[in-house]
Amino acid sequence: MTRLDQLEKQIARLRRRAEQLNVISGKYWTARRIIFVAGALLALAFCNFAGTTTAWIVAAVLGIVFSIVTIFHTRVRDSLTRNALLIEIKQVQIARIQLQWECLPGIDESRRSDANHPFESDLDITGERSLHRLLDSAVTKEGSERLRSWLLSSRPDAQLIEHRQSLVRELKGHSLFRDKLQLLSAVARISTAGPASSKSGSSHWNSKILVDWIEQSGSKKSLLPTVLFLSILSTLNIVCIVLWALDLIPRIWPFVLVLYMGASYWQHSLIAGAWGELQGLEKALRHFQLVFGYLETRSYQRTPALAEICAPFAEEGKRPSIEMRKLGRLAAALGVRTNPLLSLIVHLIGPWDFFFTYRLEQIKKEIAHLLPRWLDAWHELEALNSLANFAFLNPDYVFPELIAETDRFAARDLGHPLLKPDSKVCNDFALDGEHRIVILTGSNMAGKSTLLRTIGVNLSLAYAGAPVNATHLQTSLFRLFTCIKVSDSVQDGLSYFYAEVKRLQALLAATKTNDRLPVLFLIDEIFRGTNSRERLIGSRSYIRALSEGPSMGLIATHDLELIKLADEIEGVTNYHFREEVHDGRMVFDYRLRPGPCPTTNALKIMRLEGLPVEAP
């Protein structure tokens, strides 16, 4: 059974479950209406025939029954919400397999690609139809950004890559854990309002807003001096009342009470927003608790690597549940203000609100220290979850083997993960000490640019710790640098040719630096922005300069004169794509072959499209 079949089967099961829950929800809804109407009628009847006391008893009993039914109904409705979210998660999984971009979560349109990055724009790592969007299953903005940074790493680290690979392998086999983490994250996002809500319009939730809010709120003046001063006054007031009651002192307690109440009123601005602040903090963190509580209580005996990441949730005395209990007690204490009589009594006894607001300050300081660690672990898990989900959805992909002994890139059945399987042709390809620079020739639309992007995208996946679209891939660590989609810039006053020259100059400069990591370059149509004579001169000189350093890579070109460099420069070799014409149609097999391209097709394409072409 394929992954697609599995997901469709799971969706069918979830839809059957939704139908059952809807039936149950309907029954609870009917029961609530019946109980409400019956309660009102019975209370009225007993009031008229059995007395007010009996009517109140009946109303109370039916009210309790109504509350119990409402609680069960709420649980069913929550189950329906989670079931719907699970169906959505599974449908998005199918969309990732089938590359249905319109069904994938939206992207942050305010986040633009960096034109100066060594490969971001050229390889479609980010953007509307990008590798990042295909992989990204994070709910938080920070989790998504972490995944993005991994895919855009320009200085790969072998130890870090292998560590991520082990985590992704571990997570890949725990689909229930991954689904539940994503589900709870989604529930937290749609349930949270107030300071933790994202207002950006992106599909991601900006959880850092809560951290900023806590840090800003925690910067207020300490209440400790005020609490001590008011505590002394309240204690003095009680002592004066007791001594007056015992006829030991005159009646001075009203003056002390007025002084105490006046001081409390004078300092009230310090705690004016405490109740609303606590409500917002408690509500936000309770929704975080959906995720944190699951990570805190889960057993990690079978997932030791995962246990290391989730360690902040299991530290003794610093668990999220402990902070939740503290906030719960504070909420109950400060909630006294909703009862005017009780509030008056406790405030006469002591500076109730001031003391518990001071305690809120202390707890917020603890949370301000702990929350970033919890969030960091969550964001790390979300990024890893995205890679593991990608591995799960593509079981035929393999994890690359990293080698350090020599500079080498070798792949079997290498394909592009952003191409649909039915239109994808995979090729074997290798770069090593004997074949360091490949001159790639071929006709228009034959597959040259696609091969460059295929190599680059798979290296991006490999260095992020993800599996790659190949049956085998062995690679050293390289600094990837591309020159594929150069464009002019009206804002910067750059022509296309000058923009290309600047890009190629940056690439060449990268190869000349004294760096332990060599450059792997991917260049498409070198110097295409100038005339053929100068392009050929410039291309030959540039390739010679590249050959003098430790770098390696591919250069796709239409200039067949460049294939002669294979006979002139050691380490330069030729590969090509070709095409055939059948029944007046261009046919491409997209198979990579050694040697220079024996054919061209520009004139053929012009003739096929009805353009005039002179006889050669």
Q: Language-model features: where?
A:
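Alpha-helical coupling/stalk and coiled-coil linker elements that connect catalytic or binding modules
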Residues: 1-443, 450-480, 502-503, 513
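ATPase nucleotide-binding head domains, primarily ABC-like/P-loop NTPase cores
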Residues: 69-70, 257, 266-267, 387, ...
